[in-house]
Design a protein with these regions (language model features):
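A short, flexible loop at the N-terminus of ABC-type nucleotide-binding domains that lies
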Residues: 1-7, 12-24, 56-59, 75-77
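The feature captures the beta-strand-to-loop junction immediately N-terminal to the Walker
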Residues: 38-40
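Conserved ABC transporter NBD signature motif
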Residues: 61-72
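Conserved ABC ATPase "signature" region
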Residues: 117-135
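Conserved catalytic motifs of ABC-family nucleotide-binding domains
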Residues: 160
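Conserved ABC ATPase signature
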Residues: 139-143, 147
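Catalytic Walker B motif of ABC-type/P-loop ATPase nucleotide-binding domains
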Residues: 164-167
Length: 175
């Protein structure tokens, strides 16, 4: 399988902190692989994951390299970063950008410039796949925490990213 993501001796230190949050992290993720990152609360899992989506990176000093598809991640145009790297945050409230469920599903595709027929088809497929048709026309603020988490996941999956990052994706799902 081709290499998709590589970290080489990556480290990160938050501003005004004496110790690094991450030190000498090296790993390779190949297309089609499924990885699980486990560790105690506060050990740096979210800090590491946010390094993989430049728009979500915290401020601080980084060292080492992150390569996506063989090139430095920071050299990828923003359009490719948005399309190829999907990220579902721990808290869906931090991810929601529109007021209606259907528009939340369509927003990313609209932002990437997809044509209307493709948007409608892909949104309908995701709504069906996740079983959210019954609340498709609801306002996002009327949803439960679990429904919001499911919507956040569906909103990223509709983009069909090459790399999908889930930061505690089931933390608020309804039983």
């Amino acid at each position: 399988m081709p290499e998709l993501l590589r970290l080489e001796h990556f480290g990160f230190t938050y501003p005004q902190q004496p110790c690094p949050a991450l030190a000498d992290v090296s790993l390779t993720v190949r297309q089609g692989e499924f990885w699980v990152l486990c560790g105690a609360s506060g050990c740096g899992k979210t800090t590491l994951l946010r390094q993989l989506k430049p728009a979500l990176r915290p401020h601080g000093a980084a060292e080492g390299r992150i390569l996506f598809d063989g090139q430095p991640l920071d050299d990828l145009p923003p359009h490719r970063q948005a399309a190829d790297i999907g990220f579902v945050l721990q808290s869906p409230e931090e991810q929601t950008v529109t007021d209606k469920v259907w528009h939340e599903l369509a927003f990313g595709l609209e932002s990437l410039g997809c044509d209307t027929p493709s948007i409608r088809r892909r949104v309908a497929e995701m709504a069906s796949f996740f079983g959210i048709q019954d609340w498709f026309h609801k306002k996002v603020d009327e949803l439960s925490g679990g429904q919001k988490q499911l919507l956040a996941l569906a909103s990223v999956m509709v983009l069909q990213p090459r790399l999908l990052i889930l930061d505690e994706p089931t933390s608020q799902l309804d039983p």
